[in-house]
């Protein structure tokens, strides 16, 4: 995720005239955003059209799917790699590379694709919109992705609270079976592929890929130690790839339109279109598909109607779901919404769930509430997470009141650093990063609150 930037440079030989260089490459894009309607992949994001098979076919789903399957795994993987698609679940790992780990000679064990629809990150609801309004895109994506990695079946693990979404998805799967699009001889390609739905039971930790696999197998949803990785030993001990709903759902469109088309959006290494959730103190909260690398300010003002009270009323933004560090208004002015730009801004794209907070927000209380969430959802398997997040939760509760000393701010920072990177899964990191963002950008607010509490305490003592 924290990939280093590649600095690409070139120079002409001293004796060669520029006009004879023969350089016909197009100039790199410098502006991003304003995605055209014809370039949108998710055409029923707001549920204005029929989400069933008939409506999906009319919008281009399942078009030439048989041809895609017959071109074979290597061709599909090639298009996905050309597209530059990176995982849309948060980590941003190159999808083509990840899927290619499965495309190796079989050792006799079946291979499986597992789709992570256990969307429990606070502020995130992009996958829910796909499941609710465009389920056939996901079912078709399972088929294309499964073909790319030679999988026998797909398991879609859906969050337990998503009752209506699971119902719509099950209807879409049934329609696809009845139309011969999946199952035996899927789409008439000679390729057999099944799709199953597994309901979760409300545990946030099951969004972690190995905990999700454990849950599918009927065990407690606790993350596994890696290695072995799921590509070697996954669900039922078989090679498995776990992928995000959005990642899988865009793959058929990439294959139909071509990887170079998808790569034409966004910056280098941050290509494609992306679903963004915009919530909090905005005039029109929404989920929208936009070009990667769109400026954060443009995203909020164009699609969400701007910050309540105007842009100058903005305090901070959490750009990628609750587990990414917040950024203040000064950073929000110019930052681009992609993996690399947000890493440089000391945060992350995460799930691209933009949580906007205006000046009326008690920023300390808001972050404390997130830490309480992570404390509640920790599985307790790793000591740094089990003890450290609980400790952070108690310290943050005192910070909300101001009942602490300024030196404790550095202690809290140190606690977060001892949790980060020292756990089996990333839940510990997700709890540590919001605290780090708060301290990095709002230390004066913490110190002022502590000073105010101390003065009030002294006044009460003097009065008594």
Curated annotation (Swiss-Prot):
> Family assignment?
Belongs to the complex I 51 kDa subunit family.
**Where does the record place it?**
Mitochondrion inner membrane
Q: Which organism was this protein described from?
A: Pan troglodytes
Alphabetized PROSITE patterns for the sequence: COMPLEX1_51K_1 (PS00644), COMPLEX1_51K_2 (PS00645)
Catalytic activity, EC: 7.1.1.2
- Function, as annotated: Core subunit of the mitochondrial membrane respiratory chain NADH dehydrogenase (Complex I) which catalyzes electron transfer from NADH through the respiratory chain, using ubiquinone as an electron acceptor. Part of the peripheral arm of the enzyme, where the electrons from NADH are accepted by flavin mononucleotide (FMN) and then passed along a chain of iron-sulfur clusters by electron tunnelling to the final acceptor ubiquinone. Contains FMN, which is the initial electron acceptor as well as one iron-sulfur cluster.
Report the transmembrane regions from the record: none
Q: Tell me a GO cellular component.
A: mitochondrial inner membrane
| Entry keyword Iron-sulfur | yes
Q: List every position bearing Omega-N-methylarginine.
A: 257
Q: Can you say what this protein is called?
A: NADH dehydrogenase [ubiquinone] flavoprotein 1, mitochondrial
Recorded hits in SMART domains, A to Z, give:
NADH_4Fe-4S
Gene that encodes the chain: NDUFV1
| Binding-site residues, [4Fe-4S] cluster | 379, 382, 385, 425
Give the catalytic activity.
a ubiquinone + NADH + 5 H(+)(in) = a ubiquinol + NAD(+) + 4 H(+)(out)
Q: Which InterPro entries does its entry note?
A: ComplexI_51kDa_subunit, NADH-UbQ_OxRdtase_51kDa_CS, NADH-UbQ_OxRdtase_suF, Nuo51_FMN-bd, Nuo51_FMN-bd_sf, Nuop51_4Fe4S-bd, Nuop51_4Fe4S-bd_sf, SLBB_dom
List, alphabetically, the Pfam families matched: Complex1_51K, NADH_4Fe-4S, SLBB_2
| Enzyme kind, highest EC tier | translocase
- PTM-bearing positions, type N6-acetyllysine: 81, 104, 375
**How does the record classify its membrane topology?**
Peripheral membrane protein
Q: Which cofactor does it need?
A: FMN; [4Fe-4S] cluster
What does the UniProt cofactor note say?
Answer: Binds 1 FMN.
Where's the transit peptide located?
1-20
Quaternary assembly: Core subunit of respiratory chain NADH dehydrogenase (Complex I) which is composed of 45 different subunits. This is a component of the flavoprotein-sulfur (FP) fragment of the enzyme. Interacts with RAB5IF.
Q: Which UniProt keywords apply?
A: 4Fe-4S, Acetylation, Electron transport, Flavoprotein, FMN, Iron, Iron-sulfur, Membrane, Metal-binding, Methylation, Mitochondrion, Mitochondrion inner membrane, NAD, Oxidoreductase, Respiratory chain, Transit peptide, Translocase, Transport, Ubiquinone
What is a single molecular function from GO for this protein?
A: NAD binding
UniProt-annotated binding residues for FMN: 199-247
Q: Which residues are annotated with the PTM N6-succinyllysine?
A: 81
């Amino acid at each position: 995720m924290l990939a280093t930037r590649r600095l690409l440079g070139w120079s002409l030989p001293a004796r060669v005239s520029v006009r004879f260089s023969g350089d016909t490459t197009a100039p790199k894009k410098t502006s991003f955003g304003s995605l055209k309607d014809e370039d949108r992949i998710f055409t029923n994001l707001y549920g204005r059209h029929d989400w069933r098979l008939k409506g999906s076919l009319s919008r281009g789903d399942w078009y030439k799917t048989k041809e895609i399957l017959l071109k074979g795994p290597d061709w599909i993987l090639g298009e996905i790699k050309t597209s530059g698609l990176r995982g849309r679940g948060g980590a941003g790992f190159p999808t083509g590379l990840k899927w290619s780990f499965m495309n190796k000679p079989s050792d006799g064990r079946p291979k499986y694709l597992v789709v992570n629809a256990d969307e429990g990150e606070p502020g995130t609801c992009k996958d829910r919109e796909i499941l609710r309004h465009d389920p056939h895109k996901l079912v078709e994506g399972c088929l294309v992705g499964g073909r790319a990695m030679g999988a026998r079946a797909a398991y879609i693990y859906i969050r337990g609270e998503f009752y209506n979404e699971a119902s719509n998805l099950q209807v879409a799967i049934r329609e696809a079976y009845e139309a011969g699009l999946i199952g035996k001889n899927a789409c008439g390609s000679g390729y057999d592929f099944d799709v199953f739905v597994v309901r979760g039971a409300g545990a946030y930790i099951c969004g972690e890929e190995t905990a999700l696999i454990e849950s599918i197998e009927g065990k407690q949803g606790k993350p596994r130690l890696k290695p072995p990785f799921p590509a070697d030993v996954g669900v039922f001990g078989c090679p498995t790839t776990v992928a995000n709903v959005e990642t899988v759902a865009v793959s058929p469109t990439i294959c139909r339109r071509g990887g170079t088309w998808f790569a034409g959006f966004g910056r280098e290494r941050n290509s494609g279109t992306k679903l963004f959730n915009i919530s909090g103190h905005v005039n029109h909260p929404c989920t929208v598909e936009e070009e990667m690398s769109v400026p954060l300010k443009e995203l909020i003002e164009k699609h969400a109607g701007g910050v309540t009270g105007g842009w100058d009323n903005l305090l901070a933004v959490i750009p990628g779901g609750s587990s990414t560090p917040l950024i203040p208004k000064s950073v929000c002015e110019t930052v681009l919404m992609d993996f690399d730009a947000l890493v440089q801004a000391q945060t992350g794209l995460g799930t691209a769930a933009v949580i906007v907070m205006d000046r009326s927000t008690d920023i300390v209380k808001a972050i404390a509430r997130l830490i309480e969430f992570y404390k509640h959802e920790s599985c307790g398997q790793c000591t740094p997470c089990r003890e450290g997040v609980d400790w952070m939760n108690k310290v943050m509760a005192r910070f909300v009141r101001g009942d602490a000393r300024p030196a404790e701010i550095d202690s809290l920072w140190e606690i977060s650093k001892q949790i980060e990177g020292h756990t089996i899964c990333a839940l510990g990191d997700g709890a540590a990063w919001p605290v780090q963002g708060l301290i990095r950008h709002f230390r004066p607010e913490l110190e002022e609150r502590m000073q105010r509490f101390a003065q009030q305490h002294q006044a009460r003592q003097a009065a008594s």
